């Protein structure tokens, strides 16, 4: 049965954060989503559909033997019932909602009610026809009430009808889970499924942790204007991809001969695959050479190019690892971040760039590569690190966190050459932090978290040219320790974000006032989504006019970039000019 919900407060929460003279962030609306299980509630992403509405993707947990199988919206029970799981954990269900940008109200809902998803390897990407593509890493739960070892996944479409993913052969069974497979679904503008594809991987049975149940991580998804689909990640055995002629493209991993089968091990090889608009294999871009592991974490599409970022580590420094003949100069002692671009016509690499890793004070380094965004001819990388980045072949870090706690970072590179132009590493507190994406205007706003519960979800304002920090404000706290942020959406001057915390309420800050939002209880996680209108005052003009990088760039009295020949008063390099 189709059912509509108004997600929270809408226009009633038209409150304003005047955090400083620079940033005015007006709260348009906020709402919460959660299951009633102790785990399994996570924000994933917000995207904009072709018709201007939003698509919001979350994960929520259900556990039928505990009476917690129903989804809650704004802390009230709904009729949406998740997987019939009776084990000692929970079933992680997918939740996809088409919402109004005006107030966050729900236009329709799609959700899963059979099969467990890994939200870190599940994604949504809008298509030009008004629909979207969704991918899910899914596996069956042996303890599910209705377990069927040929049934992988089930989705309730927007009209209330079910769509089942059933396989021709039985799934390999572990003690509690089946093997995982990657499901690709094409939805139309009305929330109905047009087609489905399943990418299975070879399950290894002659290894210590047999059988290997998770053999491929599909880490990233994007689409182009023609409906072509791009997927990327890491595979550790063989990956089977359907082709239009009813044959199968097989990708064979060459570096995991000694793999134990533990899904947490760093092993396997990267892949980027192009599928046509019907979900069939077209082409691929793979790694060559020897490595301990290589992985693609993020991809973005723009003007016939696919941009990507990932991590790699060699077995020995003398090993050669490359993509399309261009080397990834990864370290054998520290994981290394790399990025590049390729033509979508032939999937040939334009450039590959490597960032040298600089160890922290304990001689180690961890990189969490959260997001890649293409905007205004620049690439913006966000994540967290507990070491530093240096130019390839150098040892002096241009961005560094010398401590052992992970800290959020933002890097900016030229999208044509790949050259790094600016960097920033969060240093505002002693807690763990991370950034998950950016809003790009005359300034940059990075969204992320500071695990200090008094700070929570933050917006950090950066100078667009230098990435020098101007201010950091908290937009949601007293929600436990926030440690997960949704991939955000920029829609003009609107920034739609989400986070996960644990507490009876989330406190959305508004200057000296607070706006508590009821979200579950202290015994389970809750997810909050918030829409903000971002505006900057005239004080930004002074900084915008004093650096060499700003030469010949003109601003009006409101601090907005304008054509130098525009009529009226313009400010160039700190001087006012009157054009008649």
Briefly describe each language-model feature range.
Residues 178, 334, 405, 546-551, ...:
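A short, compositionally biased
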Residues 17-21:
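Sec/Tat signal peptide C-region and signal peptidase I cleavage site
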Residues 52, 566-569:
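A glycine-anchored, Pro-Gly-centered beta-turn/N-cap motif
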Residues 9-16:
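Bacterial N-terminal signal peptides
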Residues 2-3, 28, 283, 569-580:
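C-terminal tail/sorting-segment detector
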Residues 22-538:
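A sequence-level/structural motif corresponding to short, flexible coil/turn segments enriched
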Residues 534-558:
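Residue-level detector of functionally pivotal "anchor" positions at catalytic/ligand-binding pockets or at interdomain
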């Amino acid at each position: 049965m189709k059912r509509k919900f108004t997600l929270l407060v809408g226009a009633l929460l038209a409150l304003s954060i005047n955090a400083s003279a620079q940033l005015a962030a007006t709260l348009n609306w906020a709402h919460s989503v959660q299951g009633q299980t102790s785990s399994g509630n996570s924000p994933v992403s917000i995207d904009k559909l072709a018709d201007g509405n939003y698509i919001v993707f979350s994960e929520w947990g259900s556990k039928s033997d505990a009476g917690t199988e129903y989804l809650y919206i704004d802390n009230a029970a709904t009729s949406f019932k998740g997987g019939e799981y009776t084990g000692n954990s929970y079933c992680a269900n997918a939740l996809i909602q088409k919402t109004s940008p005006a107030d966050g109200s729900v236009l329709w809902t799609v959700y899963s009610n059979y099969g467990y998803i890994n939200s870190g390897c599940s994604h949504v990407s809008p298509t030009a026809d008004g629909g979207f593509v969704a991918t899910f890493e899914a596996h069956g739960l042996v303890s599910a009430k209705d377990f069927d070892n040929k049934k992988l996944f089930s989705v309730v479409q927007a009209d209330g009808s079910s769509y089942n993913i059933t396989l021709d052969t039985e799934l390999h069974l572990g003690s509690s889970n089946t093997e995982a497979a990657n499901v690709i679904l094409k939805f139309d503008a009305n929330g109905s499924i047009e087609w489905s594809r399943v990418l299975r991987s070879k399950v290894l049975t002659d290894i210590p942790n047999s059988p290997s149940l998770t053999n491929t991580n599909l880490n990233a998804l994007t689409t182009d204007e023609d409906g072509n689909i791009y997927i990327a990640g890491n595979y550790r055995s063989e990956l089977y991809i359907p082709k239009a002629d009813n044959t199968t493209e097989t990708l064979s991993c060459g570096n995991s001969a000694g793999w134990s089968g533990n899904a947490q091990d760093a092993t396997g090889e990267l892949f980027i695959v192009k599928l046509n608009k019907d979900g069939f294999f077209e082409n691929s871009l793979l790694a060559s050479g020897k490595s301990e592991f290589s992985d693609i974490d993020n991809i973005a599409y723009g003007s016939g190019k696919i941009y990507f970022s990932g991590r790699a580590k060699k077995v020995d420094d003398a090993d050669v690892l490359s993509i399309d003949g261009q080397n990834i100069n990864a370290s054998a002692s520290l994981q290394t971040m790399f990025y590049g671009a390729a033509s979508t016509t032939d999937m040939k690499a334009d450039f590959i760039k490597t960032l040298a890793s600089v160890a922290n004070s304990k001689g180690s380094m961890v990189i969490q590569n959260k997001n890649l965004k293409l905007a205004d001819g620049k690439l913006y990388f966000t994540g967290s690190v507990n070491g530093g980045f240096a130019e390839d072949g150098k040892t002096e870090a241009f961005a560094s966190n010398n401590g052992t706690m992970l800290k959020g970072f933002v890097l900016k590179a030229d999208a044509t050459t790949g050259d790094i132009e600016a960097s920033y590493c969060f240093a505002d507190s002693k807690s763990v932090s991370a950034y998950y994406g950016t809003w790009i205007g005359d300034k940059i706003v990075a969204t992320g978290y500071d695990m200090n519960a008094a700070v929570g979800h933050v917006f950090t304002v950066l100078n667009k040219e230098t990435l020098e920090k101007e201010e950091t404000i908290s937009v949601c706290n007293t929600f436990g320790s926030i440690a997960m942020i949704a991939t955000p959406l920029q829609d003009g001057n609107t920034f739609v974000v989400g986070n996960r915390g644990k507490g009876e309420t989330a406190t959305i800050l508004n200057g000296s006032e607070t706006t508590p939002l009821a979200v579950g209880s202290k015994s389970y996680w809750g997810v909050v989504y918030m829409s903000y209108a971002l505006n900057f005052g005239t004080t930004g003009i002074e900084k915008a006019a004093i650096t060499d990088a700003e030469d010949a760039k003109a601003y009006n009295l409101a601090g907005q970039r304008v054509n130098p020949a525009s009529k009226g008063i313009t400010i160039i390099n700190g001087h006012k000019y009157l054009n008649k």
